[in-house]
Amino acid sequence: MENRHGLLVDFLVTTASGTAECAVVPSVMDDLRERRFHPETVGLDKGYDTRDLVAKLRARDVTPHVAQNTAGRRSAIDGRTTRHAGYAISQRIRMKVEEIFGWLKTVGGFRKTRHRGLEKVGFAGYLVGAAYNLVRLARLVATPTPA
């Protein structure tokens, strides 16, 4: 998600596993750079707080704004990141991603897909994501009507 306007930047469907998400993030960052989109930061939830992922993102000159997972261990995010005002802002804006998922599931009808296979589900996801962006763009450019 792009922070300024809340637009969906990329959408990827993977197999359901506990570690697939962390393995995919670096390749998504590489794909975004190939499309000339150079994010300086990426906001992620607690499930992405691993030393390996944080190191891979920093190697790509992307600052990981990962929610700290301190349940029984030390977080991979240190004070270099958390002391900046941008980190706090990113953590607040991160909740908008959940709003996108809510829209995709309710309005977009993507709660229970009727397709099978990663390719078909991924294509359907791109269509629903594009519809979300169109609705979002329409709201952004809409002129308010005088009362």
Annotate each language-model stretch with its function.
Residues 1-147:
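Anion-binding and metal-coordination hotspots
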